[in-house]
UniProtKB/Swiss-Prot annotation:
Source organism (scientific name): Streptococcus suis (strain 05ZYH33)
Disulfide bridges in this chain: none
Pfam entry (one): Asp_Glu_race
Task of the protein: Provides the (R)-glutamate required for cell wall biosynthesis.
Signal peptide stretch: none
Gene name as annotated: murI
Sorted UniProt keywords: Cell shape, Cell wall biogenesis/degradation, Isomerase, Peptidoglycan synthesis
Catalytic activity: L-glutamate = D-glutamate
The name this protein goes by in its record: Glutamate racemase
HAMAP family: Glu_racemase
Length: 264
């Protein structure tokens, strides 16, 4: 047993989609979440800058005595997850491999689409992971640089969001039967994405798949939180406005939370 919290990092609020799923699946686990909304989105930034910022988030979580770190950000996973995983002596989980594995299981036609930030798509990491597991699977990747800002600005339910999503996804409509939401911000746009792609297209939430893998790792390393420990205090931190973060988080997660501002 290990009653220390699980650390989550993201460029902003997108990783809340992973945290929410973990809280649903493992309600007895405690989380510490840091979202770097002041510098979001990470997708358009140079790889070295993403690496620097991500290490700052990692080091912040380490000061909170976490037992595991979850990269709840596809861009950070693509750029620096392997490096962090090798250097830390606690488990470090990324969102890309779980999403890639789920896509292979879901597709019936062998045609998978991947949505992501400019950096995630440029890295080609989803194609690499999917085709390493299933070489015959065709992967069509599409950068969606306007999606994460819609979520960070709490505009993901607006008419503008619908317009942007429909225009962006047009090249993929009718081309794939499975679509990976390769950025943890994108599940907040899920209803619009589903409507744009059609009801028969399977959407893969890489963050939700990641949450399932967290449970497996906790069991493997025997670091589950004691189920008799009732004093659970989730902690949320942001580099931007706590009020803005709190508004999005509470509407998405359906719970009251306390958010603190931090400078990195």
């Amino acid at each position: 047993m290990d009653n220390r919290p699980i650390g989550f990092l993201d460029s902003g609020v997108g990783g809340l989609t992973v945290a929410r799923e973990l809280m649903r699946q493992l309600p007895h686990e405690e989380i510490v979440y840091i979202g770097d909304s002041a510098r979001a989105p990470y997708g358009p930034r140079p790889a070295e800058q993403i690496r620097e910022y991500t290490w700052q988030l990692v080091n912040f979580l380490l000061t909170k005595n976490v037992k595991m770190i979850v990269f709840a950000c596809n861009t950070a996973t693509a750029v620096v997850w392997e490096e962090v995983k090798e250097k830390l002596d606690i488990p470090v989980l990324g969102v890309i491999l779980p999403g890639a594995s789920a896509a292979i299981k879901a597709t019936q036609t062998g045609k998978v689409g991947v949505l992501g930030t400019a950096m995630t798509i440029q890295s080609d990491i989803y194609r690499e992971k999917i085709q390493a597991l299933s070489p015959e699977t065709q992967v069509d990747s599409l950068a969606c640089p306007k999606f994460a800002p819609l979520v960070e600005s709490n505009s993901h339910q607006s008419s503008l969001a619908k317009k942007v999503v429909y225009e962006t996804l047009r090249p993929l409509v009718g081309q794939v039967d499975t679509l990976v939401l390769g950025c943890t911000h994108y599940p907040l746009l899920r209803p619009i994405i589903q409507n744009a792609m059609g009801k028969d297209v399977k959407l893969i939430d890489s963050g939700a798949e990641c949450a399932r893998d967290i449970s497996v790792l906790l069991n493997y390393f025997q670091i589950n939180r004691s189920r008799t420990e009732k004093d659970i205090q989730h902690r949320f931190y942001t580099t931007a406005s706590p009020a803005a973060f709190k508004e999005i988080a509470e509407s998405w997660m359906g719970i009251d939370i306390h958010v603190e501002h931090v400078e990195l």
